[in-house]
């Protein structure tokens, strides 16, 4: 495990898929790719390399209006996306954020087709 920490997601997916197949347990688990998924091409690449699903955390946040101020962990997100603070969360319009996220996913879906 230690030898594979920090490798690019493409190499990690292929390596995990291959190892699970060698062990005969690939059918017993799912590979979910996370990190570095920035566009629909990255989704296609991950699936082609053996991932069963992808996680698109940062792309989804940016679609919702995140400016990458990197304060998520503080709970003081300037745009109200990653916060529990009632005053800051007023800055996020959930309907607009949802529409933007739907547009991102719909666009990626059309590109993948």
Describe the residue ranges of each PLM region.
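Conserved thiamine diphosphate
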Residues: 85-99
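Glycine-rich phosphate/ribose-binding loops and adjacent secondary-structure elements
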Residues: 1-89
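C-terminal extensions of enzymes
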Residues: 95-113
